[in-house]
A protein has these predicted regions:
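A short, conserved, highly charged catalytic patch centered on acidic carboxylates
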Residues: 1-105, 119-122, 147
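Preference for the N-terminal adenyl/adenosyl cofactor-binding alpha/beta module
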Residues: 2-16, 130-371, 401, 405-414, ...
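Surface-exposed beta-strand-to-loop junctions
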Residues: 10-14, 68-69, 299, 394-398, ...
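Signature of N6-adenine DNA methyltransferases within the class I
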Residues: 22, 56-62, 79, 83, ...
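Active-site catalytic microenvironments for nucleophilic, acid-base chemistry
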Residues: 36-39, 96, 191-196, 322, ...
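Flexible phosphate/Mg2+-sensing switch loops adjacent to catalytic phosphate-binding sites
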Residues: 47-50, 204-208, 331-350, 372-401, ...
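Structured loop/turn residues at beta-strand edges in well-structured enzyme cores
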Residues: 69, 101, 347, 352, ...
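Conserved alpha/beta enzyme-core scaffolds, especially Rossmann-like or related mixed alpha/beta domains
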Residues: 170-172, 398-405, 519, 524-528
Length: 560
């Protein structure tokens, strides 16, 4: 669990007092850095090594003073030495490092002065030992307060999708297929994310793989099965002699690790792929890309038949802003100077409920929830000081306000896990602002994702219309010629005796079903759809039915 910022600042002050007179580069430098990591409640041994050998240009060899692979490179000098030269020396090590090992930060110190280089943001900072306590926020990446910008277009999202796709193919090739494979991959997605976002202790999963499994991969499947069981077991029910490498993992709950799966068989190459996945910085991965991740794993024929397609974040925002977000921000601006009204508005946010009746892997629900939580944080900044005692008591919006229906099991599983992940990212954002570590473990609430054919079940069985506020999503576009027998039967069932309905796209069934569902309510609906339903022969059939028989009104529309 991450320390509070107040505790970190106090430790930094004590650290500065203890080390203010040290001058020698080699004599005490390792103790210095061990104590430095302890400021943030992290064991240096767990994440970084001293004197890491590395090959330099021209066949020369060197040793990095302190190296945390993929995160931090430290060069340490005696007091008064040239720190600019030390930075050049640090950069000279880069050609000898693997892509996954390249650090995001370089830190130079001579006991008295610190120079931190943020390579991703292209920024650098300089301060003295006595000023360290004022600058500890710069080291949030050590403490667990990760401030990465999560960008949907970040190349790491594509890397993650490709690597998980490789692992999927390898497991499928050896006969590990169907539901066990799908759930197994979903669990690995959670583990990768938990590794880099302070759900687990830093490097706990990677260290478990590197140190507790054989290089040939022969025992990897059984070791992962053992880990899954530990993650599903409360601390008080675990064996007293449980291996220390497993005992540190938290109790997750949420039923994610509840089902016992067949043990998969790995080889050295498959183990290597999994390790490469772990070397990625999963804190930078957007849960909203899990849809494209899912698509990268499906074969093309399967994807075409499902009508699956990934909607960009920009297009999702074009839908949710006029549907509900713009209105909520307008209300926020009106009430933010009146704390009583603002508190009532905060309560209102926690009562909103959202349904995506064709949710896929949850892109719309994820982004809608993220935006709701961002607005909630703006409210909390006004209502509460940064010294609030327990931030868990003031965060009211939660994943159980979000509901989805998905015909395929795998994306339904991904959607539920992705909602937990975006929830954790939002909790880290709030932790950063209030200076407290806030994590919802064990998992007690979850998004209500139902695995079913949305056109064959009653939506009221998922959520009652009295409770629901908004319907949104991206139902599948499948033209009349591409529809299979089950889809044609769905169309007949939904449109019943509507004349000419045989020419309609499959997506129109969601329009009619939603129109029936929202009768005599204030529920608003917005879908992304093919433009064929607003031009040509489909217009007179679909919209006449919606306007004449259900009183539907169009509030907004966009062309993409």
């Amino acid at each position: 669990m991450a320390l509070s910022w107040n505790e970190i600042k106090n430790r930094a002050i004590n650290f500065s007092k203890e080390w203010e007179k040290e001058q020698r580069e080699h004599a005490e430098s390792q103790s210095f850095w061990n104590d430095f990591f302890n400021i943030f409640g992290i064991s240096r041994k767990r994440v970084a090594s001293f004197e890491e050998p590395v090959k330099k240009l021209g066949e020369q060899r060197g040793r990095i003073d302190l190296f945390w692979k993929g995160t931090l490179l430290v060069e340490h000098k005696s007091r008064g030495k040239d720190l600019a030269k030390a930075y050049t020396q640090a950069m000279d090590y880069f050609p000898g490092l693997k892509e996954a090992e390249l650090p995001k930060y370089i830190l130079i110190s001579d006991f008295e002065t610190f120079k931190l280089y943020d390579l991703e943001e292209d920024k650098n900072y300089e301060f003295t030992l006595n000023e360290l306590y004022k600058n500890v926020h710069l080291f949030g990446f050590i403490a667990g307060y990760t401030k990465h910008k999560v960008v949907a277009e970040d190349p790491i999202n594509i890397q993650a999708a490709q690597m998980m796709g490789k692992l999927h193919d390898k497991l499928k090739d050896v006969g590990y297929d169907g539901h066990p494979l799908e759930l197994f991959l979903v669990r690995l997605l959670f583990l990768g994310f938990a590794e880099d976002t302070s759900i687990f202790e830093k490097r706990a999963f990677l260290e478990f793989l590197e140190n507790k499994t054989s290089e040939d991969g022969s025992d990897l499947g059984s070791k992962l099965t053992e880990l899954f069981q530990v993650l599903n077991t409360p601390f008080e029910k675990r064996l007293k002699n449980l291996d220390e490498s497993l005992a540190t993992f938290p109790y997750v709950n949420g039923k994610l690790f509840e089902e016992f799966l067949p043990i998969p068989s790995f080889d050295s190459k498959m183990r290597e792929i999994l390790l490469e996945c772990c070397y990625l910085d999963w804190s930078k991965i957007s849960p909203a890309i899990f849809g494209s991740l899912f698509q990268s794993i499906m074969d093309k024929e399967h994807r075409r038949n499902l009508g699956a397609h990934y909607t960009s974040e920009a297009n999702i925002l074009k839908l949710i802003r006029p549907l509900f977000l713009d209105e909520l921000y307008e209300k926020f601006e009106k009430v933010k100077k009146n704390k009583k009204q603002l508190a009532e508005f905060h309560k209102e946010l926690s009562t909103l409920h959202f349904l995506d009746p064709a949710c896929g892997s949850g892109n719309f629900l994820i982004i809608a929830y993220r935006e709701l939580r961002i607005l909630e944080l703006e409210i909390l900044k006004i209502l509460y000081s940064e010294n609030v005692l327990d931030i868990s008591s003031i965060v009211w919006c939660d994943v159980d306000q979000f509901h989805g229906i998905e015909v395929e099991e795998f994306p339904a599983q991904i959607a539920q896990v992705a909602m937990w992940l975006i929830d954790h990212q939002m909790n880290m954002m709030i932790s950063e602002h209030f200076g407290q570590y806030f994590v919802r473990l064990p998992l007690k609430k979850s998004a209500n994702i139902v695995h079913a054919n949305s056109l064959q079940i009653s939506w009221e069985d998922v959520i009652s219309k009295e409770k629901l506020t908004y319907i949104l999503g991206n139902p599948p576009f499948i033209g009349k010629k591409e529809q299979n027998k089950e889809q044609k039967d769905d169309m007949v069932r939904i449109f019943n005796k509507v004349q000419g309905a045989g020419v309609l796209d499959y997506v129109t069934a969601w329009y009619l079903k939603a129109s029936k569902y929202i009768q005599n309510t204030k529920i608003k609906v917005a879908f992304v759809s093919t433009n064929s339903i607003v031009q040509g022969e489909q217009v007179g059939i679909l919209w006449k039915e919606l306007f004449s028989n259900y009183g539907i009104k169009i509030h907004f529309a966009h062309q993409t």
